[in-house]
């Protein structure tokens, strides 16, 4: 199996509910009871895999994106892709941890759990069973900016998915007994996902320091003290405030037409009344006035360093080309085995066992450019920080060669093309852009914007944003291992990004 095939197989697994890791700093997990035979699982998987493993060029032949809005304010976005009789159906709510009140961190994620705990029409646990019996897979995810629910299934079952989703948009029970059980699941999830994982602790602590005022400083899964104090009324209040058609976007990608989807959307979501949404009062992040660092002491085998620089995002009115140049900068540093960090720190100097750079410009709040690395035995996290700084200084002083940039561009564009061959990835792109307040036309513009980035622009964004005045550094100081970390998530874990 070639690298491209492995990548497409991974995308297909992600699309049908396998554990996946969408980014360096966000893990996605959920265990859902599946009451169906191995044969049905195999058939569903092969059906979906066939949809994702056609030639990459097929993605460009797909129909254009069609967007509509129901009278109640719900957005409906459809992208036809007729390569297989499959649809990916996603309902996105523009509410995440960014919208939580102080003292209730984690409630967006807890509510995501509760929406699988039944309505008057669909008892607890039945949602996933019904989708499974129809030959599909369902899942959900919570992030800083949004909460999403999705199903991947045969196109003939789209109406079933929309009926179930419209039901829980307004009829979720959020019963006290189910909440009491589920909050314990979430607390155990936090222990497994963060408290027992030293690098996750480093990332959590860095965010809390780097964002002084903005709610991005809070973990999506919530602080343990807030989870322990959370009441069922908190989840109900959050649900009643934010789960409304005028705060939701339906995204469907697959073997359907826009007319078919819109007809079903009107049937199932049209009768739901719009709501007056709460006023979003999000504290703006003050300007950082100097570098800051912190040390996290936790049981671990190796040290680790994580660096975060304040950076713009696509929705910033003055950003223009800068987010695309930052994307190219991340690829120059860490786009492949021959990229600068791996070539210099790992293979030549051998002071790091791994080193990475990452940037994500799709967000409702302020952005970050991350560098991270694990030192080799005998080296410290602070020594590795200096080496990372040295690579940045060298790039700023000497610039990026045109040959280097063209190689990175080719790889980035190829990766984007193959990712777009996945129906699930297409739906993810459309939904995440919508939640950030960005037009879906950016999907088609993305490759051209990357191609237009110049070597001077890559150097310029490095010089402008990778500076001490916007830097926060977190070091992991490994402590003796006191016990074995759980190898698998606890039962009932759902998505939290």
Placement of each model-derived feature along the sequence:
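Acidic, Ala/Val/Gly-enriched low-complexity intrinsically disordered segments
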Residues: 3, 12-15
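Bacterial N-terminal signal peptides that target proteins for export
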Residues: 7-11, 21, 29-45
């Amino acid at each position: 199996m070639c690298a491209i095939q492995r990548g497409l197989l991974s995308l297909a697994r992600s699309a049908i509910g396998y554990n996946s890791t969408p980014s360096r700093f966000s893990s996605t997990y959920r265990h859902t009871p599946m009451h169906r035979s191995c044969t049905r699982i195999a058939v569903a998987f092969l059906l979906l895999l066939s949809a994702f493993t056609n030639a990459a060029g097929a993605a460009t032949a797909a129909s254009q994106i069609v967007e509509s809005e129901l009278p109640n304010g719900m957005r409906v976005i459809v992208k036809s892709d007729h390569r297989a009789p499959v649809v990916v159906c996603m309902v996105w709510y523009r509410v995440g941890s960014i919208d939580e009140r102080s003292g209730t961190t984690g409630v967006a994620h807890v509510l995501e759990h509760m929406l699988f705990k039944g309505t008057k029409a669909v008892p607890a646990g039945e949602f996933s069973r019904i989708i499974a019996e129809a030959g599909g897979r369902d899942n959900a995810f919570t992030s800083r900016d949004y909460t999403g629910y999705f199903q991947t299934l045969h196109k003939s079952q789209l109406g079933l998915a929309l009926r179930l989703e419209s039901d829980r948009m307004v009829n979720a029970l959020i019963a006290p007994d189910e909440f009491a059980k589920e909050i314990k699941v979430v607390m155990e999830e936090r222990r497994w996902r963060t408290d027992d994982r030293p690098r996750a602790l480093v990332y959590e602590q860095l965010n809390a320091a780097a964002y002084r005022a903005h709610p991005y400083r809070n973990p999506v899964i919530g602080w343990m003290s807030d989870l322990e104090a959370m009441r069922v009324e908190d989840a109900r209040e959050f649900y009643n405030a934010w789960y409304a058609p005028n705060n939701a976007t339906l995204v469907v990608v697959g073997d359907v037409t826009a007319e078919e989807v819109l007809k079903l959307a009107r049937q199932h979501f049209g009768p739901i009344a719009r709501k007056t949404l709460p006023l979003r009062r999000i504290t703006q992040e003050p300007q950082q006035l100097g570098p800051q660092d912190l040390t996290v002491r936790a049981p671990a085998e190796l040290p680790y360093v994580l660096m975060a620089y304040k950076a713009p995002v696509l929705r910033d009115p003055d950003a223009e080309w800068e987010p695309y140049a930052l994307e190219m900068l991340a690829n120059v540093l860490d786009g492949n085995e021959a990229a600068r960090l791996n070539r210099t720190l790992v293979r030549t100097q051998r002071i790091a066992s791994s080193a990475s750079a990452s940037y994500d410009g799709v967000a409702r709040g302020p952005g970050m450019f991350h560098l991270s690395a694990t030192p080799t035995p005998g080296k410290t996290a602070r020594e590795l920080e200096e080496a990372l700084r040295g690579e940045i200084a060298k790039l700023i002083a000497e610039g990026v060669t045109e040959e280097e940039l063209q190689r990175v561009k080719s790889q980035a564009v190829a990766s984007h093309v193959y990712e777009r061959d996945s129906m699930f990835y297409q739906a993810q792109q459309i939904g995440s852009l919508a939640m950030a307040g960005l037009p879906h036309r950016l999907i088609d513009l993305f490759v051209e914007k990357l191609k237009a980035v110049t070597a001077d622009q890559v150097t310029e964004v490095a010089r402008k944003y990778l500076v001490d005045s916007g830097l926060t550094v977190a070091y992991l100081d490994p402590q003796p291992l006191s016990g074995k970390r759980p190898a698998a998530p606890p039962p009932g874990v759902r998505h939290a990004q």
